[in-house]
């Protein structure tokens, strides 16, 4: 599993890009490191790029993770676009999107254009290829 991210503080935006097999343990470790970043409270928009990723945990673990995410999400005044093209990630993202806490705040997208429109940001494919993303 590979995750890299970049903060765009002028836009109150965090972009994270996941590749390979996403495990519950790997996702939890990433979240723990992310929570320690002092820039996180300034973020109001999240773009998660998961086009090249696959969820490698059970449905029960997916539900468990959503519950953990709800408990650790102190600020629900965010907008989160999840850009995906794989069935496993789409199913996982759907559990988040359908939860009452995240209703109207999370959108599953199949194109970057849809995601940027939902978040009201200007990001291009070339921005996602930048070498200054931090690898986790």
Give the ranges of each region predicted by the language model:
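Amphipathic, Lys/Arg-enriched alpha-helical "gate/interface" segment within cytosolic domains
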Residues: 1-136
């Amino acid at each position: 599993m590979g995750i890299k991210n970049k903060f765009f503080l002028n836009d109150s935006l965090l972009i994270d890009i996941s590749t390979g097999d996403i495990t519950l343990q790997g996702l939890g470790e990433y979240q723990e490191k992310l929570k320690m970043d002092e820039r996180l409270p300034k973020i109001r928009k999240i773009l998660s790029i998961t086009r090249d990723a696959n969820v490698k945990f059970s449905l029960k673990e997916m539900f468990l993770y959503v519950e953990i995410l709800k408990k650790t999400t102190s600020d629900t005044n965010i907008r989160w676009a999840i850009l995906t093209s794989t069935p496993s990630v789409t199913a996982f993202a759907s559990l988040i999107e359908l939860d009452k806490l995240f209703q109207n705040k999370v959108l599953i997208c199949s194109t970057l254009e849809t995601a940027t429109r939902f978040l009201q940001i200007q990001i291009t494919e070339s921005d996602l290829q930048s070498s200054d993303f931090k690898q986790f």
